From Swiss-Prot:
GO terms for cellular component: cytosol. One of its GO terms (molecular function) is amino acid binding. This is Aspartate carbamoyltransferase catalytic subunit. PROSITE patterns: CARBAMOYLTRANSFERASE. It comes from Methylorubrum populi (strain ATCC BAA-705 / NCIMB 13946 / BJ001) (Methylobacterium populi). Heterododecamer (2C3:3R2) of six catalytic PyrB chains organized as two trimers (C3), and six regulatory PyrI chains organized as three dimers (R2). Its EC number is 2.1.3.2. The gene is pyrB.
Length: 315
């Protein structure tokens, strides 16, 4: 199925995985499959967004996500503007609502937003007339990361239904974990979360996941091991005794990975802290999908932008 024949995406914005149906998710993944094929050709451009303006508004630093959205927009023919918050009016005290009004006056077609506060992207979406994509809001959601993870798994395992996926590490501060839990369960996976009790959200069991504080126990029989970055910049107190101690119990090395299924695959949303949550030989090893995730990120973001373009005037 090509992107042109993929089922229509019914939403004007992509603010999170929560609220998407299974057909919505599968529609985006089908579009992304077509975008992978396009990205591997010599001529990589489409004209889907020709004449359209895309603003990337990042209130938090990002290298891979921002550059991935920029490349995705350009491959679809959009005029892409990266707004530097560090040198903008936001740093001078402008509120998010004022920023939204200012950007709206520029009449963009799509705004891609990353913000440190959960819910900020939803607020901005209510104040503008264009499509909005959530590129990560606080510890709330990161929908395109979950979509690219699902695409990577599907292309390597043939599907997601029935797989056991372990999400390991700093679940408490991770928007990636939240979006992946929702999406993977929607597609029929069994999800486990593994980490020290200090890095697991209170009441996470209500999401229908299995919870383990012993990593060796939690990895047994897993098809996918998804490691999370230890987000020390979001930690006000002492969540782990030391980096060395954390790696000993929760860092993925060969001994721990051997407890998963023999054909288990390893993922990480990046950026990685080598020697903290993952050993270098595992990150660079034959079971690692980490580099492929980066490629899938561009394809998924192309798919999302293309799907939202169908709701633009004359889209």
């Amino acid at each position: 199925m090509t992107a042109q024949t993929a089922p229509a995406f019914p939403h004007r914005h992509l603010l999170g995985i929560e609220g998407l149906s299974r057909p919505d998710i599968e529609s985006l993944l089908e579009r992304a499959d077509a975008a992978v094929a396009l990205s591997r050709q010599v001529e990589k451009k489409r004209t889907t967004l020709r004449g359209r303006t895309q603003i990337n508004l990042f209130f938090e630093p990002s290298t891979r996500t921002q550059s991935s959205f920029e490349l995705a927009g350009k491959r679809l023919g959009a005029d892409v503007m990266n707004m530097s918050v560090a040198s903008s009016s936001v740093k001078k005290g402008e509120t998010l609502i004022d920023t939204a009004a200012t950007l709206n006056a520029m009449r963009p077609d799509i705004i891609v937003v990353r913000h440190h506060a959960a819910g900020a992207v939803h607020l901005l979406a209510r104040k503008v007339d264009c499509a909005v994509v959530n590129a990560g809001d606080g510890a709330h959601e990161h929908p395109t990361q979950a979509l690219l993870d699902a695409l990577t798994i599907r292309r390597n395992k043939g599907g997601i239904e029935g797989l056991t996926v372990a999400i390991c590490g700093d679940v408490l501060h991770s928007r990636v974990a939240r979006s992946n839990i929702i999406l993977l369960q929607a597609l029929g996976a069994r999800v486990r979360v593994i980490g020290p009790s200090t890095l697991l959200p209170t009441g996470i069991e209500r999401f229908g996941v299995e919870v383990f504080t012993n990593m060796r126990e939690g990895l047994k029989g897993c098809d996918i091991v998804m490691m999370l970055r230890l987000q020390r910049e979001r930690m006000n107190g002492s969540f782990v005794p030391s980096v060395k101690e954390y790696f000993r119990y929760y860092g993925l090395d060969g001994d721990k990975l051997a407890l998963a299924k023999p054909d288990a695959l390893v993922m990480h949303p990046g950026p990685m802290n080598r020697g903290v949550e993952i050993a270098s030989d595992i990150a660079d090893g034959a079971q690692s999908l980490i580099r492929e995730q980066v490629e899938m990120g561009v394809a998924v973001r192309m798919a999302v932008l293309e799907a939202l373009a169908t709701h633009l005037p004359n889209g």
